Amino acid sequence: MKRYFAILAFALCCVGILKGQTATDSLTIVFAKWEVTHSQKGIVCKSVSLPMLYNCPQVINMIEIDPSKGMKARVGISEGMKRTSFIAAEHHALAAINGSYFNMKQGNSVCFLKRDGLVIDTTTIGEFNLRVTGAIYERKGKLKLIPWSREIEKKYKRKRGTVLASGPLLLENGKACDWSRCEENFVQTKHPRSAVCTTK
C-alpha cells in the first residue's frame, strides 16, 4: 500500500476530532465533498468548506504528499521571526505549515529543536504543561511522529536528523492519545490548528 504524508492545515478547531465528536460530525467528515485545488506529481491539495462541524462553520485544507513520487518532508529552520511563507521560500518548499510553538516577542522556539546533534532550543515547562506531548523526527526527507515528554527530552541522544517537539500528539498506532497532560483551555478553545499525520 502506498505511504502518504498528509498535512492537514485546519482553519478550524480540531478539538472535537478525538473528544466529543458526534455521529453527525463523523458523517459530515466522511461525506464531505473535497475540492482538489492543486495537483502535481506526488502532491494533491484539497479543500472543503463545511457549514456546520463541531457546532460552527469550518474550512479544512489538506495536502497529501506521496514520498514514493520523490517528495520529501523537511523541518525548516530560520533565524528570527519570519512568516511561514518566507521560510518556505527560503527552503524552496512546495508547501509548509508552522510546525510548533515559539516566543512571539523573541522569535525563538519554545519547544525542543535539535538538528544533527546540535540542540537549538529546549521545551519550556509551560509548554510541557500546556500541550507538548509529541515530536516530529525527520531524516533524509522521511518523517516519523513520536511521543514526547520532559523525561524523553532529558535523555534524547540521537545525533542524526532533526527533531521538533510539538503537540498534542493526537494518535499513536491508530489509537487516541491521552490528553490529560494537556491544559484543558488549550484543548477546548477554538483556534486555527495544523496537524501532521503519516499513513501506511
Put a short name on every predicted segment.
Residues L18, D66-S68, S149, K175:
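Generic signal for short, ordered secondary-structure residues
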Residues E90, G107-K200:
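Aspartyl protease catalytic domain
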Residues Y4, C14-L18, G76-S85, A89-H92, ...:
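Generic structural signal for short, solvent-exposed loop/turn connectors between secondary structure elements
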Residues Q21-A135, K142-L145:
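Zymogen propeptides
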Residues M1-S26:
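Bacterial Sec-dependent N-terminal signal peptides
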